[in-house]
Curated annotation (Swiss-Prot):
Component of the plastid Sec protein translocase complex, which is composed of at least SecY and SecE. It comes from the Eukaryota. Belongs to the SecY/SEC61-alpha family. GO terms for cellular component: chloroplast thylakoid membrane. The chain crosses the membrane at residues 43-63, 97-117, 144-164, 168-188, 201-221, 226-246, 289-309, 334-354, 390-410, 414-434. GO terms for biological process: intracellular protein transmembrane transport; protein targeting. Disulfide bonds: none annotated. It comes from Heterosigma akashiwo (strain NIES-293 / 8280G21-1). The gene is secY. The central subunit of the protein translocation channel SecYE. Consists of two halves formed by TMs 1-5 and 6-10. These two domains form a lateral gate at the front which open onto the bilayer between TMs 2 and 7, and are clamped together by SecE at the back. The channel is closed by both a pore ring composed of hydrophobic SecY resides and a short helix (helix 2A) on the extracellular side of the membrane which forms a plug. Keywords: Chloroplast, Membrane, Plastid, Protein transport, Thylakoid, Translocation, Transmembrane, Transmembrane helix, Transport. It is a multi-pass membrane protein. This is Protein translocase subunit SecY. It is found in: Plastid, Chloroplast thylakoid membrane.
């Protein structure tokens, strides 16, 4: 994280209210505000989404889709915890794009974890600039292909009962088709990112959540009276978790910066100092802690059941295997909350290294008021960063536990598909799109004004 990147991401977003009266008169019509460049980018994204829909509608050959649909009440969770472009849960069909963005997401996670183990990768990410970034993209693509092939083989092998005349050759063919679909999704994701409107991977996850949300809401509230006590509890829970998602996503801790070389007079100095700050989010790790915990909980649960069955076979603690469901759910929620806190603290450390930030500040000639550059700055940033990460982790964990318990008590499936992670993704993507569109519009407005005044 460099100072310039930090500063640009927040100071370049200008509010439309800053346009003066003359500019508003000139560019009032809506058709003028939505510029040609913006229209092209939005149309590009719409076309790419249409391609995804077509790909999902193309069924895989050799598979008895009718038989598969009849046995799909407990469909394979192909996308992990909601991380696919459009999952099989939404389409109820095994199609070309069934794997979605999952292999790419998993590849990115694995590479980020590898940065901790391999210092050369960390150096490649931080010090080699554009060439290093291109190498990392290439590594991500290779790893995505490897994961897509692996996931395809396991998926097709698990569906062998629904495949006409099962053979190893058909396993190879279908795996190639699914892997190709995953790589096409990766290409679409990169194309969406290049439009500058939003991050491609996040947008595809956003599409997945939105595609299944209406059905989940309808099923969950079908037998629930929203004016009853249970309905009020559900509405209150939604309000709390949505507020928490907004708070985690939008709250910034601002550290003002000083630079003695900038600003020669009082007015210039004041303007410069007001625009210099180091922003830290409460939730630097985003939804990754929830994703990690979602992957790990089923493994721990399966292992725990196996151990309990082994213990029960010796009749040592027979009461353990007869725990009521509410106790099991409570223990699972507590373990998940603990894992989320651990992963949030760990993953936040991967995203921002206070030592690197302190070094970058010192090289750029910036310092924090009343804090000496170097070691003192690093210690101060570490302290602030740990406190913010802990607060964000606790809020994240509390909301996950709250949604799990309320969903379990009132038997609401919507809380599984509309978790705090989903809310953060939805809010983050919508906010990013609005900010990027606003910035593009203002950039074009000021460009026209500048050209007109020449």
């Amino acid at each position: 994280m460099t100072l310039e990147k930090n500063k640009d991401s927040f100071t370049n977003i200008i509010d439309l209210s800053l346009i003066n009266k003359e500019q508003k008169v000139t560019f009032t019509p809506t058709k003028e505000i939505y510029t040609e460049l913006l229209k092209k980018r939005l149309l590009t994204i719409a076309l790419l989404v249409f391609i995804i829909k077509i790909g999902m509608a193309i069924p895989l050959p050799y598979i008895d889709q009718t038989k598969l649909l009849n046995n799909a009440t407990s469909m394979f969770d192909l996308s992990g915890p909601g991380l696919a472009a459009v999952s099989a849960r939404a389409s109820q069909k095994i199609g070309l794009f069934t794997l979605g963005i999952t292999p790419s997401i998993n590849a990115s996670i694995i590479l980020q974890l590898a940065f901790v183990i391999n210092p050369n990768l960390k150096k490649l990410q931080r010090e080699e600039g554009e060439s290093g970034r291109r190498k990392l993209i290439k590594y991500t693509r290779y790893l995505t292909l490897l994961l897509a092939i692996t996931q395809s083989v396991f998926l097709i092998f698990s569906l062998r009962a629904f495949i006409f005349e099962w053979s190893i050759l058909k396993l190879f063919e279908l795996s190639c088709v699914l892997s190709s679909g995953a790589m096409i999704i990766l290409w679409i994701s990169e194309c969406i990112t290049k439009t500058g409107i939003t991050n491609g991977s996040s947008f595809l996850i956003f599409l997945n959540i939105v595609s299944v949300l209406p059905e989940q809401i309808g099923m969950s509230f079908k037998n629930l009276d929203i004016f009853s006590f249970e309905g009020l509890i559900v509405i209150l829970t939604f309000s709390i978790t949505v507020w928490a998602a907004i708070f985690l996503q939008q709250t910034l801790y601002i550290i003002p910066l000083k630079n003695p070389k900038l600003g020669q007079n009082e007015l210039t100095k004041k303007l410069v100092e007001d625009s210099l700050y180091l922003p830290f989010r409460l939730n630097q790790a985003g939804v990754m802690p929830v994703v990690f915990a979602s992957y790990l909980i089923p493994i721990l649960k399966t292992g725990g059941i196996y151990i309990l069955l082994k213990i029960n076979s010796f009749n040592l603690f027979p009461f353990l295997i007869k725990f009521p469901e509410v106790v099991n759910q409570s223990l699972e929620s507590i373990v998940e909350a603990g894992l989320i806190c651990l992963f949030a603290l760990f993953y936040s450390g991967l995203i921002i290294d206070p030592k690197d930030v302190a070094d970058e500040l010192q090289k750029s000639g910036f310092f924090i008021f009343a804090i000496r550059p170097g070691e003192k700055t690093r210690n101060y940033l570490e302290k602030i960063f740990k406190e913010l990460s802990l607060i964000g982790a606790l809020i994240l964990a509390f909301n996950v536990v709250l949604l799990n318990l309320v969903g379990f008590v009132f038997n609401l499936s919507i809380f599984k598909g509309f978790s705090i992670g989903s809310q953060i993704i939805l809010l983050g993507v919508v906010t990013e799109i609005l900010q990027k569109v606003q910035a593009l519009v203002l950039n074009d407005v000021y460009k026209r004004i500048r050209d007109r005044n020449k």
